[in-house]
Amino acid sequence: MSNKGQTLQDPFLNTLRKEHVPVSIYLVNGIKLQGQIESFDQYVVLLRNTVTQMVYKHAISTVVPARAVNFQVEVPAE
């Protein structure tokens, strides 16, 4: 994954995690998962509901927060 992808997704996912925002995660096969983001890394997201699920990022189509979130994107010096 490119650096630009990480500079967008990491602050977004981290804000959702820190603020305990409920999310709907849609997978590429159309399945909808709901819960709160517990943790994430380069390849997976841990989604907590009644149980914690490990969801591979390559299977995720869309992440939809239950409410609007504000997050800061750090622009790397070029």
From Swiss-Prot:
Matches recorded under Pfam families: Hfq
Name of this protein: RNA-binding protein Hfq
PANTHER family: RNA-BINDING PROTEIN HFQ
Family listed: Belongs to the Hfq family.
InterPro entries, per the entry: Hfq (IPR005001), LSM_dom_sf (IPR010920), Sm (IPR047575)
Phylogenetic classification of the source organism: Bacteria, Pseudomonadati, Pseudomonadota, Betaproteobacteria, Burkholderiales
CDD domains hit by this protein: Hfq (cd01716)
Keywords linked to the UniProt accession: RNA-binding, Stress response
